């Protein structure tokens, strides 16, 4: 654990049961923690920073992360957190249950423009799992890899922690591998429950849609991560809710 991380945890303990807040600042000497005062009217439920604190942190160096805590709460960013994180364009570090959970500033999961290898179905899959607290590797994937003798999804699911489950046992957060104009599975979607899936297909924005007969026919297999727990879908759901109210 770094000195910065130790300072973050100590500040969160001092502030509890109120939420702590602050910044990680990079200077020529290295990274350090810049604690702020939570001026929220309900500090046990929300945090708010004074503009003066933000300016003071910027004067110290480059702000590289925003930090706050969820005392007694959940280790995922809330709906409000995600909305504000996207606006801030910063990584957010969340203190919860004595640990620091670090979230990259990924775009909202819905409404993304498709670009193969940059913002495609695997990017959506990876970013959704990141928000749920599970890290997935990024890897190069050439155009039309499924037509060039590669089977990237099936070759990598087990090595990245997934195991296959029966389609009849689908739970929110499971990953559907589909054959989209291909004889091998070349498309991933996240099952959201209630007959809905979240995915990103070429020439469309990423979206939630019904798991219709069309997609059921295209489904090759269903996979679940060994570290998955049902509550982890909260991290994904909160982003979907934030995006639906984002203005």
Stretches found by the model and what they are:
Residues 1-65, 71-104:
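Conserved beta-strand-loop surface patch within small alpha/beta domains used
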Residues 58-74, 205-206, 210-221:
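Extended, compositionally biased flexible segments
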Residues 110-115:
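Second-shell loop/turn segments in exported
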Residues 116-132:
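Active-site nucleophilic cysteine motif
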Residues 136-141:
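Surface-exposed patches in mature extracellular/periplasmic domains of secreted proteins
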Residues 142-206, 212:
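...with weaker cross-activation on analogous glycine-rich loops/strands in unrelated enzymes
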Residues 209-247:
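Glycine- and charge-enriched low-complexity intrinsically disordered segments
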């Amino acid at each position: 654990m770094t000195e910065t991380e130790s300072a973050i945890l100590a500040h969160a303990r001092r502030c509890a049961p109120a939420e702590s807040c602050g910044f990680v600042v990079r200077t020529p000497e290295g990274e350090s923690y810049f604690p702020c005062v939570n001026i929220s009217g309900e500090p046990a439920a929300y945090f708010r920073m004074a503009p003066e604190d933000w300016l003071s942190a910027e004067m110290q160096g480059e702000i590289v992360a925003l930090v706050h805590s969820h005392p007694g709460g959940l280790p995922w960013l809330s709906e409000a957190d995600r909305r504000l994180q996207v606006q801030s364009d910063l990584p957010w570090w969340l203190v919860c249950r004595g640990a620091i959970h670090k979230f990259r500033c990924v775009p909202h999961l819905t409404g993304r423009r498709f670009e193969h290898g940059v913002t495609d179905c695997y990017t959506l899959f990876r970013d959704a799992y990141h928000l749920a607290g599970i890290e997935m590797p990024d890897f190069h994937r050439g155009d039309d890899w499924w037509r060039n003798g590669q089977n990237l999804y099936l070759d990598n699911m087990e090595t990245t922690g997934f195991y296959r489950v029966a389609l009849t046992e689908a739970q929110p957060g499971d990953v559907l591998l589909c054959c989209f104009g291909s004889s091998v599975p070349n498309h991933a979607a996240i099952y959201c429950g209630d007959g809905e899936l979240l995915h990103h297909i070429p020439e469309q924005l990423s979206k939630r849609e019904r798991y219709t007969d069309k997609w059921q026919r295209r489904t090759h297999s269903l996979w679940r991560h060994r570290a998955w727990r049902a509550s982890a879908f909260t991290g994904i759901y909160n982003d979907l809710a934030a995006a639906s109210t984002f203005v």
